[in-house]
Design a protein with these regions (language model features):
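Secretory targeting and sorting signals
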Residues: 2-36
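C-terminal, loop-rich substrate-recognition/catalytic regions characterized by aromatic stacking residues
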Residues: 38-41, 346-653
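N-terminal cap/lid segment of alpha/beta-hydrolase-fold proteins
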Residues: 41-87, 453
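Accessory cap/linker subdomain of secreted extracellular hydrolases
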Residues: 42, 61-63, 67-70, 103-104, ...
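Short beta-strand element of the alpha/beta-hydrolase
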Residues: 87-97
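Catalytic nucleophile-loop/oxyanion-hole region of alpha/beta-hydrolase
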Residues: 146-165, 174-177, 341-349
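Short beta-strand/loop motif that positions the catalytic acidic residue
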Residues: 295, 301-303, 307
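Conserved alpha/beta-hydrolase "acid-adjacent" motif
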Residues: 308-314
Length: 653
């Protein structure tokens, strides 16, 4: 997303081309014609009479080793009238492994078909809403799922090529057929090739992966709660986030016939993703961040800042890479967990997505590129904007822990501390246990708090915590969390809806047919009153101290230093609250425990939190002046225990 004109903006071929086109149009159009140029696509085409068809696109891969290249099923809904008039339309595409196994959206919708095999129900509202407005909607079954050939390889070459091949077909560079096994070719003469990819979780992940190939014709992507590097879905610097690997996921989403023929691919996944947490070529292939320089499409990122399925590190590192490479971009950050914006900000989302696609795919000058880059949910259903994100005044500040009056109850300031604090890993405790007892001396954590703030402090971006620790055993896992200490009302991201409640009433978003309703259940924010909020977290295996790529056994009694990458966030700690850093061992429910139960001694002089503060160190100094440290001896109330509730990116509530 280009930043407002008053800021220096990145310039690339897209903005140059847009400027050139605008200049040409200005010279050719009369004032009346220029004034009447469309700013919004209108629902003028019939959805009921739309063309519904299926095509199988050749991926040029043979993932299942049957001697034939794999074809992926492509279900299409497109307006009939432009086709009759010889006018070409752009495409909105959602490539997914979930269309037959698991469903899409809050209501877990599946594709359904008529007797001819053409799609009847296309999950979600995109086809109902956008086809009448002059777009085609395309739902792609990834290789190894539903009606496609091949095997699921969990974000690898086959998954990405499944969708990239369709973009190529839409632009006349790949072969398509009217059936899965036949020889009758199908061409996409009805489209101008301009494609936008969208999807939540696994679907949005594929959009990231295809964009990272730089494929021509992909104009924009809208990744919602999407993975940017598959290693970071399963591990955090060697620490396992789940008790199973990607082989479980591929088996879960594959069609029954693919499951029967893809044993060799399954074994490659097992071999390539060892439970040691070591980085392998398998993970390199599935790291889209390394190829972010190839991204030519604009990117509209949406992510929940409390997403404990696809954790916010994914959008943070992807966003930073996009910024470094001058990609046009926009972002929404909610207080929810793994939730689609259709279910936490429905009307605004439909309008914004409509204008985004109109701008990126139809070329309408509707002003969305001059609006603030970021929308951030500051409190349930209360949103603020930021012209750029993170704000330009953001600077990384080193906050230092120091000893306090009680063991494990220390201070956090700009001054370097000294001495040690000791804790023992308790795999039965999690971040809510630690935060609830932040002002009490407990054996399982070391906590450090600022003075009560006299001014608001805003953290915006990704934090890091560098820990120097001496373990008593040969293995140790570390957790670090940032906590806002003070009363608040937040979305209850630990509840089953991850911050939303689903009601019985419905709202409709476009026309419906007998087999495809545009009406979806209404949702509302599910909130909790809390005494603290954990707003950023990170983990690591101390055995990875020397290398992010490979761990090693620890020597008991030896001092090690490691840096934990905390999740990206945008959070305001208000005046009167305190900011806390907690360092502990296993964060139960969010990482697996180590093979032993270590006690760790923190070297406070060599431990720090590097946090992105708007206004930098000066803002922090002002906010912590004029008050004194407090240590109330009380147990604080928070949400329920956090859990990595799914091993499936995009799992339903």
């Amino acid at each position: 997303m280009r930043t407002p004109a008053r800021y220096k903006r990145f310039t690339n071929w897209r903005s140059l081309a847009t400027a050139a086109t605008a200049a040409l149009m200005a010279t050719l159009l009369t004032p009346v014609a220029a004034h009447s140029a469309p700013r919004e696509s209108a629902p003028v085409y019939s959805y009921e009479n739309a063309i519904r068809e299926s095509v199988w696109v050749d991926t040029k891969l043979d993932g299942d080793s049957d001697g034939k290249t794999d074809r992926v099923a492509v279900d299409i809904v497109r307006p009939r009238e432009p086709a009759q008039q010889g006018r070409k339309v752009p495409v909105i595409m959602d490539a997914s492994p979930y269309y037959s196994c698991c469903g899409r959206g809050n209501e877990s919708q599946l594709k359904t078909y008529d007797a001819n095999g053409d799609v009847v129900q296309m999950p979600l509202y995109y086809d109902n809403y956008f086809v009448p407005r002059g777009y085609a909607f395309v739902g792609v079954d990834l290789a190894g799922t539903n009606r496609s050939d091949g095997c699921v390889d969990v974000g690898g070459r086959s998954d990405v090529q499944s969708a990239k091949a369709v973009v190529d077909w839409l632009n006349g560079r790949a072969k398509g057929y009217t059936s899965r096994t036949g020889t009758t070719k199908a061409k996409a003469g009805w489209t101008n090739g301009k494609t936008g990819m969208i999807g939540k979780s696994y679907d949005g992940t594929i959009a990231n992966g295809v964009a990272a190939t730089g494929v021509e014709g992909l104009e924009t992507i809208v990744p919602i709660a999407a993975i940017s590097s598959w290693y970071d879905y399963y591990f955090a610097k060697g620490a396992p986030l789940y008790d199973s690997g990607p082989e479980w996921l591929s088996d879960y989403v594959e069609s029954p016939d693919a499951r029967a023929r893809c044993a060799a691919v399954q074994q490659k996944i097992v071999d390539g993703a060892p439970r040691t947490g070591d980085w392998t070529k398998f993970w390199t292939e599935r790291d889209y961040v390394k190829d972010v320089r190839k991204v030519d499409a604009s990117v509209f990122v949406i992510h929940g800042m409390q997403d404990l399925n696809v954790r916010p590190k994914h959008f943070g590192q992807w966003w930073d890479g996009l910024a470094e490479n001058g990609v046009d971009r926009k972002i929404w950050l909610s207080q929810t967990g793994h939730v689609d914006p259709f279910d936490f900000r429905r009307a605004e989302w439909a309008d914004t997505l409509h204008r985004w696609f109109d701008h990126e795919l139809l070329g309408y000058d509707n002003g969305i590129d001059d609006e603030p880059m970021a929308d951030i949910e500051r409190a349930p259903d209360q949103w603020v904007t930021s012209d750029v994100w993170p704000p330009r005044a953001t600077d990384t500040v080193s906050l230092r822990p120091a000893k306090g009056a009680q063991a494990g109850v220390g201070t956090l300031s700009l001054r370097t501390g000294s001495g040690t604090e000791t804790f023992t890993d308790d795999p039965r405790q999690d971040e809510t246990d630690w935060a609830a007892q932040i002002d009490q001396s407990t054996s399982a954590k070391a906590g450090f708090t600022t003075k009560p703030l006299t001014r608001d402090v805003r953290l915006s971006g990704s934090s890091k915590v560098t820990v120097t620790a001496t373990p008593t055993t040969s293995s140790a896992h570390l957790s670090a969390v940032l906590v806002d200490l003070g009363p608040d009302t937040i979305r209850d991201y630990s509840a089953s809806g991850e911050g939303i409640s689903t009601l019985t009433d419905r709202t409709c978003w476009g026309p419906s047919t007998t087999g495809d309703s545009s009406c979806f259940k209404v949702t509302r924010a599910k909130t909790a009153n809390v005494d603290y909020t954990v707003f950023s977290r990170g983990w690591a295996d101390l055995g990875n101290h020397a290398s992010d790529a490979k761990g090693e056994p620890l020597t008991p009694g030896k001092r090690y230093t490691i840096t934990l990458d905390l999740h990206a966030s945008d959070h305001v700690v208000p005046a009167g609250h305190r900011l806390a850093l907690i360092i502990a061992g296993t964060d139960e429910g969010l990482i697996d425990p180590p093979s032993s139960t270590p006690t760790l001694a923190l070297d406070l002089a060599r431990t720090k939190a590097s946090v992105p503060l708007v206004g930098g160190a000066a803002a922090f100094a002002r906010a912590t002046s004029g008050s004194s440290y407090v240590t109330p001896d009380a147990t604080l109330d928070g949400i329920g225990e956090p859990r990595a509730t799914h091993r499936v990116p995009g799992g339903t509530h």
